[in-house]
């Protein structure tokens, strides 16, 4: 499972990832989350460009054949883009969870990124989650 952890991004304990791209942060869910969820049937993003999001608050839901889960913002900021491709093709998350981003935002406090788990810490978290 640790091999499914990308080193170019940070993670939350709820299994969202945050990748810094210039002055923006792109957000999605990890391979561990996808494996736990199973086949994704619906991605519902409740925010739109221009909205302000607070770290730890839900920005949408993801539904699979097994369950419905909230999607949480890893950092606070202003929504710049939403991946509308996921409306019609939620299976993109199963196919490539690190390519199928969900939201892009401009962080209001870049230090929040440093508070997220780096890839090594996230891999350690997954070891305990697997037991």
Segments from the language model and where they lie:
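A short, compositionally biased micro-patch
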Residues: 20, 64-65, 74, 108
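Aromatic- and Lys/Arg-enriched surface recognition patch
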Residues: 80-104
